[in-house]
Amino acid sequence: MVAFTPEEVRNLMGKPSNVRNMSVIAHVDHGKSTLTDSLVQKAGIISAAKAGDARFMDTRADEQERGVTIKSTAISLFAEMTDDDMKDMKEPADGTDFLVNLIDSPGHVDFSSEVTAALRVTDGALVVVDTIEGVCVQTETVLRQALGERIRPVVVVNKVDRALLELQISQEELYQNFARVVESVNVVISTYYDKVLGDCQVFPDKGTVAFASGLHGWAFTVRQFANRYAKKFGIDRNKMMQRLWGENYFNPKTKKWSKSATDANGNSNQRAFNMFILDPIYRIFDAVMNSRKDEVFTLLSKLEVTIKPDEKELEGKALLKVVMRKFLPAADALMEMIVLHLPSPKTAQQYRAETLYEGPMDDECAVGIRNCDANAPLMIYVSKMVPTSDRGRFYAFGRVFSGTVRSGLKVRIQGPNYVPGKKDDLFIKAIQRTVLMMGSRIEPIEDCPAGNIIGLVGVDQFLVKSGTLTTSEVAHNMKVMKFSVSPVVQVAVEVKNGNDLPKLVEGLKRLSKSDPCVLCTTSESGEHIVAGAGELHLEICLKDLQEDHAGIPLKISPPVVSYRESVSEPSSMTALSKSPNKHNRIFMTAEPMSEELSVAIETGHVNPRDDFKVRARIMADEFGWDVTDARKIWCFGPDTTGANVVVDQTKAVAYLNEIKDSVVAAFAWASKEGPMFEENLRSCRFNILDVVLHADAIHRGGGQIIPTARRVVYASTLLASPIIQEPVFLVEIQVSENAMGGIYSVLNKKRGHVFSEEQRVGTPLYNIKAYLPVNESFGFTGELRQATAGQAFPQLVFDHWSPMSGDPLDPTSKPGQIVCEARKRKGLKENVPDYTEYYDRL
């Protein structure tokens, strides 16, 4: 069945147990888009000849040029299973037709926020791993993201053709290679074991691992071969599957199975995987590549594969492609694995509801989500915005978790800051149209029931990046997505021609809509600042801004890194500030927090929204806090979730609760703009020791308390030997031995240091991991390629904040220079103010 109509899609959408929502995730350049091609080609959207190099899902021109996926794209495919396959289904299904909603996501680490957006709306993931390179840093990151969202993985070991043609390794070596890759994936999976999700490990003999060559368009699972042999020898398929992987050997002479490589008489047995699966493949490769055509055709007739007369004329790799594609079509193997081993929305939403929904688990929305019920109140999570062909408008791309969405329906559009019962961040508007996403095209569709992925027209003006759409008045939001990267590289953008300013402002709004991880801000001096996850991410964002969103020439400053201000020891004396009317006093000290706790707050392990008793317990047990202190945390900052806290250590202060709001507001302000150069504070703990307040309420209003609290935060920070923290990238480089020297010289020049290097077993490649300050990372990729003659490919991921040595208050030191430059750029006074500016005498 080739081109299927929206009506047929609509029919399948109504059977949630026959829908599969899945994303394709992997390390950069392991072949996601190429593999996706085979699946798309099965659905008849591109021709078989093009599959493997069309990269249909890379819809943008710059994606085709660079050969790297930038945005995640969705497409709906149709799969038919045979009755025989249906017997192995883990869950009940309705008929043999399946709808697979597939999202191809980028692998490059700068775009991992796109991956997060894709994972949120899917229930299963196809993890692609390169046979030769194995599990890399980004494979691990995306797997961790997937398991954190409770998404079930299946694995494809890709690029098998490279192992056969380039490395020419023996069958046993190839088996060992596969076994190693599968094992290292399982190690990552078992690290993030989740009781509710159960065991997610993958095994070739269970059918959850496929071996493929995306470029040549062929793939197989152990199950497919077991099927073949089960028919031939008349034995049970599932028994055969277990025999075809692991330590199972077969002796062709005696026709006996054994568990060891040699039998009692010393005859050697052959590993079943090598003999029954790899042998036919090796033979075909051998015969085709050494152009022994007659041998090829006898092999094909034995394997019951027929090819067309005109295809018999082909030579070399072209013939190999055709033969392997006919023998082991990639789409069949992958579709079978997706349908049999990934959960349907009906199953998945039962265990994902609690990680998706913020409200109580027994209100009507939560129940609707859990049952994936098309008649419940509508709940849609919009995970990102997709630009339309019509300039400046966006489709909202998301998933219906419960209810049914149709054109013209009035919905409540809740942004990420919406609180039930309040009116902030809430719009009530009608949806203009609902559409199906098909790669670069869209198909209009009447309505869309729970469990499906959908595009909406007409809500883009009311949402920035993501949000919840619902028809229920009591609905809470769906949880906000946690991104694994943070925007640390910023540039200032100006227009060349003053009249274009409104266009720039409008363009920045659109840019921040279209990319989940970009941050556009306006500083107090009126600069427009764009922040991104890394050099490549920023480059693409600015290109989009100039060409699509704003459409005007821009002046772009050299990139600037964002720093954090922190303290290195407790305040040398207690800081005191008096209010402007001299009637109120606040006493405070600052001290550093442990790095572990700061990271725990940033990753959400210690959460400001948790119950304070639970949180206090965690902080006391894991981070050695005093329980009473941990219970009396007033707030986190900046943005109520940052890694700084205010602790109330006062004893018996009258009217204290009345000023709590003012202090929290002041702290939010102070922690966003630190005293040294107006960067965010990080990992500081502020203790309020004592507060003296005026008895008369009119003399202790917000106007008196807020400036005072802010000054006392600044004073206590400057008294606690302040330091600055710079962001550090984790660099992973894969390189052959002869280019190692070049890497070390480039890293040493840029203040980087290598902390691990290991050789990949069975290959001449080394894996090098190093830390590199973000400040030094500009142009790093280019220099590295020069030094290693283009052999090394670095992956840079933001890893942690590291304190810089040197006193930032001394203008001659390195941190001091950074502070001075930043102050000049922001239009502040040259020198850092002394603590006495904020400190009042008793």
From Swiss-Prot:
It comes from Schizosaccharomyces pombe (strain 972 / ATCC 24843). Residues 17-253 form the tr-type G domain. InterPro entries: EFG_II (IPR041095), EFG_III/V (IPR035647), EFG_V-like (IPR000640), EFTu-like_2 (IPR004161), G_TR_CS (IPR031157), P-loop_NTPase (IPR027417), Ribosomal_Su5_D2-typ_SF (IPR020568), Ribsml_uS5_D2-typ_fold_subgr (IPR014721). PROSITE patterns: G_TR_1, G_TR_2. One of its GO terms (cellular component) is cytoplasm. The modification Diphthamide is found at residue 699. Its main location: cytoplasm. Catalyzes the GTP-dependent ribosomal translocation step during translation elongation. During this step, the ribosome changes from the pre-translocational (PRE) to the post-translocational (POST) state as the newly formed A-site-bound peptidyl-tRNA and P-site-bound deacylated tRNA move to the P and E sites, respectively. Catalyzes the coordinated movement of the two tRNA molecules, the mRNA and conformational changes in the ribosome. SUPFAM superfamilies: EF-G C-terminal domain-like, P-loop containing nucleoside triphosphate hydrolases, Ribosomal protein S5 domain 2-like, Translation proteins. This is Elongation factor 2. The modification Phosphoserine is found at residue 568. SMART domains: EFG_C, EFG_IV.
